[in-house]
Amino acid sequence: MNVEQVYKDANALLEGHFLLASGNHSSRYLQSAKVLEYPQKASLLTDALAEMIRENGIEVDTVCAPALGGVIAGYELARSLGVRSIFVEKKESGMELRRGFEVSPGEKIIICEDIITTGGSALKAAEAIEALGAKVVAFASLANRGFCKRVGGSNEAKSECKLPKDVPFFALEDFTFEMYTPEECPMCKEGSTAIKPGSKG
């Protein structure tokens, strides 16, 4: 499957001048919400991700996603794997289970996101789950922004990657875009103004 083409077909791979959450700028942006608005495309992607996880012998009881961005991807991956789906939500520091969700000691959990950049949110989700006695057996995402090394990927982990090195990370594709500080951004130097994509438009 050509994952990049699936994103392009769904208008989920944007080109322009973007202000990222990190404060850096980029000429490309992944908007996974656009690819996930089509249940058939979401199923296609998570079925492929589930197959990778199975092929690597990962046993899992539950998929847990950080809200909000990971919820649909996590739910669909759980469906593809035939297990239950839960999510954690932000609190003042870190994340927590709410809404009556529970995990058991030793329960095998995969943390799933739509996109993993440095893995910061996924790591906070893992810490919340492991504090309750469950075991995180893998991290997964549809797309990897290239800071973390995925199973089968050619990219090496960069210093910004927050995922633990001893837990496998599965993703369908590496999307490595150039990022610039505002001071070094060539688009800014040409007079362009960065726009903030994501939840507000």
UniProtKB/Swiss-Prot annotation:
Q: Name its pathway.
A: Pyrimidine metabolism; UMP biosynthesis via de novo pathway; UMP from orotate: step 1/2
Q: Name one GO molecular function term.
A: orotate phosphoribosyltransferase activity
Q: Say which enzyme class the record assigns.
A: transferase
PROSITE patterns named in the record: PUR_PYR_PR_TRANSFER
Kindly list the positions annotated as binding orotate.
Answer: 117, 145
Top-level division of the source organism's lineage: Bacteria
UniProt cofactor(s): Mg(2+)
What's the catalysed reaction? orotidine 5'-phosphate + diphosphate = orotate + 5-phospho-alpha-D-ribose 1-diphosphate
**InterPro entries named among the record's database cross-references:** OPRT, Orotate_PRibTrfase_bac, PRibTrfase_dom, PRTase-like
Q: Which GO terms describe its biological process?
A: 'de novo' UMP biosynthetic process; pyrimidine nucleobase biosynthetic process
Q: Does the keyword Magnesium apply?
A: yes
EC no. given is 2.4.2.10
Q: Name the UniProt key words of this record, in alphabetical order.
A: Glycosyltransferase, Magnesium, Pyrimidine biosynthesis, Transferase
Similarity comment text for this entry: Belongs to the purine/pyrimidine phosphoribosyltransferase family. PyrE subfamily.
The task this protein performs is described as: Catalyzes the transfer of a ribosyl phosphate group from 5-phosphoribose 1-diphosphate to orotate, leading to the formation of orotidine monophosphate (OMP).
By what name is this protein known? Orotate phosphoribosyltransferase
Native organism is: Sulfurovum sp. (strain NBC37-1)
Please spell out the taxonomic lineage of the organism that makes this protein: Bacteria, Pseudomonadati, Campylobacterota, Epsilonproteobacteria, Campylobacterales
Q: Which gene encodes it?
A: pyrE
